[in-house]
Structure formats: structure tokens, C-alpha cells
Amino acid sequence: MKYIFVDESWEDYLYWQKNNKKYVKKINELLKDISRQPFTGKGKPEPLKFQYSGYWSRRIDAEHRLIYKVKDDEIHIVKCRFHYD
């Protein structure tokens, strides 16, 4: 699968690379798991509602979430820092 970071999510990822390598490792593990099993697996995947209808969330930790959408053979990452706004 191909990973596509959307605007803010790439900035989030770069933030973690600079400030917390532990979160980068966790995000990479989640992305690898998503490519194998998009809607089950690590990080307690759950479908989102309202403005994020069609998207899924996985826990990075208690505060931060990885929000993504699977389209064909692409994983679109929308956020990987904070909760949904």
C-alpha cells in the first residue's frame, strides 16, 4: 500500500521526528499494521463519525490519534497528533 500524508499530518509526523522518536516508531508500527489489516489490529481501530465519516482512528497514546482513510491501495493519513478537532 502507498502512504499519502495530507497537509497537516506530514507536519505532525515531522514534529514527532524532531521531538519524540518513540511516537515515530509507534506511528510506523500502526501504518504497517494498517497496510496488512486496515480495520482491525493494533491501536484499537474505530470508525469515525460526523466530519470524519469514512475515516478511521487508531490510538498512538491516550492523547494522540492516527486518523486515516483507505482508498484502493492507498492509505491517506489526515492526522497523527492530538485528538480529532
Briefly describe each language-model feature range.
Residues 32-59:
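A short, surface-exposed loop/turn module that caps and links secondary-structure elements
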Residues 2-4, 8-25, 49, 57-65, ...:
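Enriched for short, Lys/Arg-rich terminal
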Residues 24-32:
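PIN-domain endoribonuclease scaffold, especially VapC-family toxins
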